[in-house]
Structures are given as structure tokens and as C-alpha cells.
Amino acid sequence: MKLSDIADNAGSRKKRMRVGRGIGSGKGKTAGRGGKGQTARSGVRIKGFEGGQMPLHRRLPKRGFNNIFRLDFAEINLDRLQEAVDAKTIDGSGVINAETLVASGVLRRAKDGVRLLGRGELKAKLTIEVHGATKTAIEAVEKAGGTVKILAPAKKDEGEAA
């Protein structure tokens, strides 16, 4: 057997059909595109159109809404705070708030405030001022000898709401 003897199995490769080449070819005139009109033209597809069948986006019910007054808090866990204190990124003796967390690079931005979450363990005695905290986070900070002060969240202006 030689390399030149190798061939595909019969019928495994189908010849490409050249369309629109006369009625005798069997694929002339409309070239398999149905009738005339928008769908017979090149590059045109009607988004979401399912051939007259009720499209999926209209079969499903409308649901929910976007609350323009929703506040988006930056979240920080206790283990991340402890890492920052251990690495001396933040000073544990002072008050830790949104400004100090952003200035030290622990958070990228404070968004509408900071929310303290309870993942991990906290050993350092910290004074924390945040806009929200979970029960477990508050308990863990107080167990370590620190305090948590919950600030009132900054209200969004009506013009600022997006």
C-alpha cells in the first residue's frame, strides 16, 4: 500500500452544490432561498424571527424590574481585613472605614458604601465604620475586642440614578 492508494470512503465527502446557475441544475432561480423578499437577500436575518411562530422572547412572561434606588456596596470579608493588618497595609490602631480601605488598596472603590461580611477569622482588635455588616461579622469583630459602627448609606440623587 502506498500513500497515493489511500482514498476516502464512498459518499463520505459530498460535492458542493453551486446554486443559482440555471433551472436545469435543480438549484436555479431562487437558489434554495424560498420566494422573493427580505429573506431571499444576502446578509439579512430578522433577529428573533422564528418563521411566524411566536418567538421565545414573546412566549416567556415579563419579570422583575430595575430599582433605580438600589445601593451597590463594596464587600469585604474578615479574612481579607486580617490579611491587610498582618501585611501592615492598613493600620489596625486607627479607625478603618471606606476611605482608608480604598487609600490602602484593599478595596478598588467604595461604590455606595462598604459592607462587612463574616468569612474567615479576625484576630486583630479593630474599630470599623461601614455602611452594613452581617451578624456573624459583627460578632467576630466584637469577640476579637473591636467595635463596628454602622453608618447610614449615602442616598443616591435622582439625577445620579442610572
Swiss-Prot record:
Gene that this sequence comes from: rplO
Gene Ontology BP terms: translation
GO molecular function: rRNA binding; structural constituent of ribosome
Keyword Ribosomal protein: yes
Any Pfam family matching the protein: Ribosomal_L27A
Protein purpose: Binds to the 23S rRNA.
Homology family: Belongs to the universal ribosomal protein uL15 family.
Region: Disordered, residue numbers: 1-41
Coiled-coil stretches noted in the UniProt entry, renumbered to this chain: none
Name used for this protein in its record: Large ribosomal subunit protein uL15
InterPro entries: Ribosomal_uL15 (IPR030878), Ribosomal_uL15/eL18 (IPR021131), Ribosomal_uL15/eL18_sf (IPR036227), Ribosomal_uL15_bac-type (IPR005749), Ribosomal_uL15_CS (IPR001196)
Keyword hit for Ribosomal protein: yes
Keywords: Ribonucleoprotein, Ribosomal protein, RNA-binding, rRNA-binding
Gene3D superfamilies tied to this protein: 3.100.10.10
One Gene Ontology cellular component: cytosolic large ribosomal subunit
PROSITE patterns cross-referenced by the UniProt entry: RIBOSOMAL_L15
The protein's assembly and partners: Part of the 50S ribosomal subunit.
Composition skew (Gly residues), residue ranges: 21-37
